């Protein structure tokens, strides 16, 4: 996956800004540490980076469950982890209207035609699950959740161990205050692992759960525009010193 990303970055000119949500966040951080000269700015939202820094429902489950259980999930899917099976496992398929209303942060009242339309769109999206390759899934469970290899510097990417301290690009960390999957501390620990100067690190904690980071009305209307403005600001590292 990192190899393909690297090919794409080269096709785009060799330097990019990266925005990584959830699992895409730790992958983006790995890329930025593996190829630090190719990432100008980095945004991580709801991304599990240092599992030992805090506990979430997901990391607690991964820690308490034997690896054989996850291998069994892959076997049941004939080499894949079936999205609808995992959804049932989490119980997220039973979201009621109040939970959806809270997640979307919409002003439309429950029972109104406008909310009914939003709810139908959400349920259609929510029912469209994605199957994951078993090899990838097991690697995430074992290396990220069981051994915390990203934070400890043991993760091997494209033949080399990843040293997060080599990543010195400006970084924005966005956490969900009530995240059931990624504890805010698991994300915010990033600032102590990377080589980015403190003045080039921005952090925000949004009043939502995990999915609200990219679906909540308030978050989309207030937090992401702030991140977008930050991304287009000049990078102070590239500014020439003022003449004496």
Predicted regions and their residues:
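Short beta-strand immediately N-terminal to the catalytic nucleophile in serine-hydrolase-like folds
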Residues: 18-20, 45, 174
């Amino acid at each position: 996956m990192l190899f393909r990303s690297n090919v794409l970055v080269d096709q785009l000119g060799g330097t990019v800004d990266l925005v990584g949500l959830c699992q895409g966040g730790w992958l983006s951080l790995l890329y930025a540490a593996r190829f630090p000269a190719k990432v100008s700015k980095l945004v991580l939202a709801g991304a599990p980076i240092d599992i030992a820094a805090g506990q979430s429902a997901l990391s607690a489950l991964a820690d308490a469950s034997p690896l054989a259980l996850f291998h069994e999930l892959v076997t049941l899917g004939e080499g894949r982890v079936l999205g609808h099976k995992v959804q049932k496992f989490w119980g997220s398929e039973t979201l009621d209207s109040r939970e959806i209303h809270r997640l979307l942060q919409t002003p439309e009242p429950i029972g109104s035609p406008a909310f009914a339309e939003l709810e139908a769109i959400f349920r259609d999206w929510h029912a469209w699950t994605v199957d994951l390759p078993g090899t990838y899934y097991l690697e995430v469970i074992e290396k990220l959740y069981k051994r915390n290899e990203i934070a400890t510097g043991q993760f091997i990417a494209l033949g080399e161990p990843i040293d997060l301290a080599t990543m010195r690009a400006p970084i924005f960390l966005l956490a969900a205050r009530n995240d059931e999957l990624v504890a805010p501390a698991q994300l915010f620990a990033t600032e102590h692992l990377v080589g980015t100067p403190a003045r080039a690190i921005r952090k925000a904690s949004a009043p939502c759960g995990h999915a609200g980071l990219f679906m909540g009305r308030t978050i989309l209307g207030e937090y992401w525009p702030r991140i977008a403005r930050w991304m287009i600001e000049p990078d102070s590292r590239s500014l020439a010193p003022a003449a004496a």
